[in-house]
Amino acid sequence: MTLRIDHVGIAVRSLDERLGFWRDALGMTVAGTEDVPTEGVRVAFLPAGEARVELLQAL
């Protein structure tokens, strides 16, 4: 059986403050952002190979 990671979620205080690090220092791209009011978060999606990093900020 082959296991793979679909995504990794990382809680941040501010997406606006942290996205620069992920883009500029790590060279990742932001595929999109989304507010998810039912979960109380704003999420940014950053593809990482076959997986993705999800940065989550509380609303």
Predicted regions and their residues:
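Core segments of cupin and vicinal oxygen chelate
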Residues: 2, 10-52
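Intrinsic, low-complexity N-terminal interaction/targeting segments
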Residues: 54-59
